[in-house]
Amino acid sequence: MHDPRPLAEKAAALLKARGERIAIAESSAGGLISAALLGVPGASAYFTGGGIIYTPRALKTLLGVAREDLKDMRSSSEPYAAFLAETVRAKHRVEWGLSETGAAGPTGNPYGDPPGHTCFAVAGPVNLARTLRTGSADRIATMWAFAEASLALLVSALEQRS
């Protein structure tokens, strides 16, 4: 099983040291990214909020984005992940946004991506986006892998800013 705590602790330390804050928009990680960051003592100093953007209704309700606002962009893509990260960052008026969007399994998504596929992005002073394919249909293991990879990307962005 993956353990994102060391990455969450590193991200928290970097955010707190600079007095910066983050908001999260995650999908198939199911709240594990937020939970890892909130599990670090003192999270209120750097974590402002976010949501699990699992459906078009959640996208509209939590971020104020309608499907027609996305034009030709599809979920589970790096451009969509970057859009979500920037949107959640701007909505919360914070320095950093982190997003994740994928297919945890045991089946793929409606866009043809296999289980274990996700895209994730960081928006802020450093912008990064990546794709991960775990090759696994194990839903729980994949969700943890998505959270860990997303936090690793966040740490990378924070370290690039240093």
What positions do the PLM features span?
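Short alpha-helical segments enriched in small residues
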Residues: 1-162
